[in-house]
Amino acid sequence: MAIERTFSMIKPDATKRNLTGAITKMLEDAGLKVVASKRVWMSRRQAEGFYAVHKDRPFFDELCEFMSSGPTVIQVLEGENAIAKNREVMGATNPANAAEGTIRKVFALSIGENSVHGSDAPETAEQEIRYWFSETEIVG
């Protein structure tokens, strides 16, 4: 098993409902360690940059509007197979398809307001972590 890092974000729908602690606890209970964390209210421009990979998708404008509508909590998580573990704990993107006990099954309001985001691959994790954090902000 490899120790790796991944990017995790608690989205505005969850921060507005004061779920940051409950979600972080679920991640930590799964064996993931928070090695960096900050609360950020994204500008529209930051949201567009972060989600640039989706710029040609029909949901892009709505996504950027939502992500800049309130605070997010962005984190770097570390642990054995952290990327896969984080995705397992988050659950399927659509909460209707998420397994019982996952973050999205428990907390998501809809497919759009699904409470969390997490990197899907090592390359994505590296890009997303670098987008928000400097090396000196990550303390393992």
UniProtKB/Swiss-Prot annotation:
The keyword Transferase is annotated on this UniProt entry: yes
Catalytic reaction annotation: a 2'-deoxyribonucleoside 5'-diphosphate + ATP = a 2'-deoxyribonucleoside 5'-triphosphate + ADP; a ribonucleoside 5'-diphosphate + ATP = a ribonucleoside 5'-triphosphate + ADP
Known cofactor(s): Mg(2+)
GO biological process, one term: GTP biosynthetic process
Pfam (any one): NDK
Active site: H117
Keyword Cytoplasm among UniProt keywords: yes
Keywords, sorted A to Z: ATP-binding, Cytoplasm, Kinase, Magnesium, Metal-binding, Nucleotide metabolism, Nucleotide-binding, Phosphoprotein, Transferase
PROSITE patterns to which the protein is assigned, alphabetical: NDPK, NDPK_LIKE
Subcellular location: Cytoplasm
A GO CC term assigned to this protein in UniProt: cytoplasm
SUPFAM superfamilies listed in its UniProt record: Nucleoside diphosphate kinase, NDK
Entries under InterPro entries matching the protein: NDK-like_dom (IPR034907), NDK-like_dom_sf (IPR036850), Nucleoside_diP_kinase (IPR001564), Nucleoside_diP_kinase_AS (IPR023005)
Primary site of residence: cytoplasm
EC number(s) recorded for this UniProt protein: 2.7.4.6
Binding site for ATP: K11, F59, R87, T93, R104, N114
GO terms assigned for molecular function: ATP binding; metal ion binding; nucleoside diphosphate kinase activity
Family: Belongs to the NDK family.
Subunit structure: Homotetramer.
Protein function: Major role in the synthesis of nucleoside triphosphates other than ATP. The ATP gamma phosphate is transferred to the NDP beta phosphate via a ping-pong mechanism, using a phosphorylated active-site intermediate.
PANTHER family, per database record: NUCLEOSIDE DIPHOSPHATE KINASE
Protein name per the record: Nucleoside diphosphate kinase
Source organism (scientific name): Chelativorans sp. (strain BNC1)
